[in-house]
Design a protein with these regions (language model features):
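Alpha-helix initiation/capping motif
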Residues: 37, 67, 98-99, 108, ...
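Glycine-centered flexibility motif
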Residues: 1, 27, 88-89, 205
Length: 210
């Protein structure tokens, strides 16, 4: 942890020296409280971006239209403080994120794929004018309890980015990874390390910004 902080400080100093005007984004995670919009943050004057998680299970606890009132309230909270917003991840594969009604068995991959596209499509259509960065997926490089293959997880990542791009061609899109140094490879055999997973996405020319 100390090494990571030292490395981040050194990189920031180098970046400031190289650029007359800093383009660095410094922010925090903005969770949705029970009373959405009531949250206040003492250090927000020092930040220029907030990360707004979007949980599929909370937005769509049962089949039907998404319930985005809390998300929209927090987006407006950030806009009222002239902050940029990174929204997402729009897809994770853990139990906390996926709705209980969704059949996520490995043999039902095509149904999950279709439901994921529909979910992301609804989000982007309703929020695209309020979001500055889309966080498409998180942690799909690593195996999960649901036993999806590496190819299926890569396909879901590509689908998420392509769905965003079909409905929003301009907003930057990012993808994040669990254990980017590949610690899980010591006990979980995979063909693609995190860096190769990322390289595959970059070579696909999907329009990912980071």
């Amino acid at each position: 942890e100390d090494l990571a902080c030292w490395d981040a400080e050194a990189l920031m100093k180098m970046r400031i020296l190289q650029q007359l005007t800093s383009t660095a984004l410094i922010g925090f995670r903005l969770d949705i409280p029970e009373q959405a919009g009531s949250q206040d943050v003492d250090f927000f004057p020092t930040a220029n971006i907030c990360h707004l998680p979007i949980c599929w299970n909370q937005c769509q606890p049962e089949p039907g239209p998404l319930k985005l009132e809390g998300v929209i309230d927090q987006l407006e909270w950030a806009r009222g403080r002239e902050m940029r917003v990174m929204a997402g991840p729009l897809l994770r594969l853990d139990d906390e994120h996926l709705p209980a009604w969704l059949d996520c068995a490995a043999e039902s991959f095509q149904q999950l794929q279709a439901a994921t596209r529909d979910h992301i499509e609804q989000l982007v259509e309703r929020l695209h004018d309020k979001v500055d960065i889309w966080h498409a997926t998180a942690g799909l490089n690593r195996p999960h309890d649901r036993k999806f293959s590496e190819e299926q997880r890569l396909r879901l990542t590509v689908d998420a980015v392509e769905t965003i791009r079909r409905h929003d061609r301009h907003t930057p899109v990012v993808v994040s990874f669990d254990q980017p140094w590949g610690e899980y490879l010591a006990h979980q055999q995979q063909d693609l390390s995190p860096i190769h997973f990322a390289e595959t996405l970059v070579r696909a020319n999907l329009g990912i910004s980071g």
